Amino acid sequence: MKITLVKKVLADGSLCGKCRDVQERLEAKGHLSLIDRTLIADVRDPQSAGITIARQYKVERAPFFIVEREGQEAEIYTIYAKFAKEVLQPAGRL
């Protein structure tokens, strides 16, 4: 399983509020190490990796998680609690 976290950077260069909140939750629970890669959707750069992948998966909010399992379509999670319950908890990671 491969997990990608996409976070949004605002025009002033700061992380969006929800992105900060999710980052803090991941850090507090020791889950940040379970994220394989983090991409930044920088509103100042329409070609940033995060914006490009958001377009690819038709996601319009951040943060979001992309969960890739071998032989399956990628799953997109835009709600942290659902991601934690469906991905982290079954994997014995909570």
What residues fall within each predicted segment?
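Short, structured active-site "lid" loops
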Residues: R55-E73
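Thioredoxin-like thiol-disulfide oxidoreductase module
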Residues: L39-R61, P90-L94
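Local sequence-structure signature of Cys/Sec-based thiol-disulfide redox active-site neighborhoods
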Residues: M1-R37
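Surface-exposed, flexible loop/turn segments at secondary-structure boundaries
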Residues: A11, P46, E73
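Short, glycine/charged-enriched secondary-structure capping and boundary segments
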Residues: C19-R20, R55, Y80
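Non-catalytic, surface beta->alpha helical segment in thiol-disulfide oxidoreductase systems
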Residues: V67-L94
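Residues at the C-termini of beta-strands that transition into short coil/loop
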Residues: V9, D42-R44, Y80
